[in-house]
């Protein structure tokens, strides 16, 4: 399977695109990111074009598509897109060892969907942006078809705002 245009746009909307290499606050020393979350062989100060960012994204997604297609060949397009987003953000190795995968392989798609929300932490703390992304991935996974991406984003922005208002 291949990620759909809607799935790719979904990932890109959460990742954002930076055409100059940067070091994220949670990144290990010496790790730089460029484009749509690309971290391979990126040098401090490196710059790329939008076309190069799009190519890096396609190259980064391809091995995820291949591994997921082999691992779970009988998922719908929206389920596949949600899984690609999950793996793109967390890494295929996190998915391979996850309860989400075990439940999906056992045919428990509702149980698998519930597992998305357990992957919202960075450095031991719940991150609102990760909550929004996992909630959106779960919603995508459970859909029988794509709702307009803008509608999904607005819904989860509102949910995120409500969550922020209730944080101590």
Regions found by a protein language model. Give the residues of each.
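Long, amphipathic alpha-helical surface segments
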Residues: 1-29, 38-43, 47-69, 93-168
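Structural motif
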Residues: 72-79
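A structure-centric signal for secondary-structure junctions around beta-strands
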Residues: 28-31, 80
């Amino acid at each position: 399977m291949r990620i759909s245009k809607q799935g790719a746009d979904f990932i890109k909307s959460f990742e954002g695109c930076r055409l100059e290499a940067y070091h994220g606050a949670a990144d290990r020393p010496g790790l730089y990111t460029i484009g749509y979350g690309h971290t391979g062989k990126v040098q401090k100060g490196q710059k790329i074009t939008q076309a190069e960012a799009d190519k890096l994204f396609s190259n980064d997604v391809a091995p995820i598509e291949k591994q997921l297609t082999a691992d779970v060949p009988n998922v719908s397009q929206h389920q596949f897109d949600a899984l690609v987003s999950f793996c793109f953000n967390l890494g295929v190795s996190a998915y391979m060892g996850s309860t989400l995968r075990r439940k999906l392989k056992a045919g428990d798609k509702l149980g698998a969907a519930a597992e998305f929300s357990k992957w919202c932490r960075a450095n031991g703390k719940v991150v609102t942006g990760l909550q929004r992304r996992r909630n959106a991935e779960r919603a995508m996974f459970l859909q029988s078809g794509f709702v307009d991406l803008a509608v999904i984003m607005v819904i989860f922005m509102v949910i995120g705002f409500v969550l922020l208002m209730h944080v101590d």
